């Protein structure tokens, strides 16, 4: 049954565009060029406004998720990488629960699996585009008209398909790392940099102030006579980015960088060369930022569905259980937010005070994030080629065994360590995300973690392919 299900995607192979894998290894310098070109295309797409929108100035309940999903409201990148991540999440679930049997050693099965994910991503893009238009993000459908509404949907689908191909281009070896991670980290870094150094001014009734926290610090110190009061305002102003958030962001960045040095060294020896021993490192963040990306995609899809249903059926009790949406003056990103239902409980607390005043919500939110991240991390290893069985095959091919163990027991020993490490690492990154949210950073804690782990991942990739020193983080960990 499962095999036949995968075969249903065979007809799409003939006409679905695909990036052909390079016949030989792409030189490092060319990979840098392809990576830069892909990033430039993505950034351009994120600046081109959608043609035909009436307005995109209204409240945006998904604002806090946009950085993590590389989304930019009112542009071709409205949907960001959400459909692609969601497609990956769906097929991870199908394979992990054995509802879809895939032989990853078979080239045909691997190709069909990739085609199936691509088709699912396109379908999800179409579905999300329809939801975004129908919920009135660009004006009511009656004002837009059917033709403009269809044009908006087509623009969103086309842009998401371009991103899909760019991601495939990098993954297949033309560039460095994953396009999804690159685009997300760039979007997050751009927003953090803007909040810290934005030269734009605002007037909130307290005189002209700079939006960027660092710029505001120097401005307040230069124009205020009371320097102590100026420092307090620069560090704790609650209506614009402040220096406490900047320092919190730097602290989280350095702490995550420090944790990257945590690993369990599995002693191994060679069966081919007598006396040759070494170690196989199992990192704390075994699956990198994948768990938090999948958790963010899951949350965004729940929010989109809940918001659409609540607009259409506000009095339906089941819809209310999924989420009731209303206006909250304390919401930092948008006045429109979930005020009850499931969506409210998986929405992060807007402040440390709210977390204390509503302990039930806080406990549910923390449990959801940690549980989802641990589950996604544990199941991701089965579809990413890093499961105990995959690693034991690599050991066998390289003539390695665990020191003090027989060759036949390698898989059994790895099975004791890797799944536990993956789940614990996923829960850890979820806990860091929650802690960062409560601490207060420039952007959400999740986005800071995603950016940090992606930057470190690119550092490792560049170190491996470019050949420069790799001990920066190890030395940093030892220093701390």
UniProtKB/Swiss-Prot annotation:
Residues 1-32, 97-118, 167-245, 384-416, 460-480 are cytoplasmic. GO terms for biological process: misfolded protein transport; post-translational protein targeting to membrane, translocation; retrograde protein transport, ER to cytosol; SRP-dependent cotranslational protein targeting to membrane, translocation. Coiled coil: none annotated. GO terms for cellular component: fungal-type vacuole; Sec61 translocon complex. It is found in: Endoplasmic reticulum membrane. Pfam families: Plug_translocon (PF10559), SecY (PF00344). It is a multi-pass membrane protein. PANTHER family: SECY/SEC61-ALPHA FAMILY MEMBER. Appears to play a crucial role in the insertion of secretory and membrane polypeptides into the ER. It is required for assembly of membrane and secretory proteins and is essential for cell growth. It interacts with other membrane proteins required for protein translocation. Upon binding to SEC62/63 complex, secretory precursor polypeptides may engage SEC61 to begin membrane penetration event. A cycle of assembly and disassembly of SEC62/63 from SEC61 may govern the activity of the translocase. This is Protein transport protein SEC61 subunit alpha. It comes from Eremothecium gossypii (strain ATCC 10895 / CBS 109.51 / FGSC 9923 / NRRL Y-1056). The gene is SEC61.
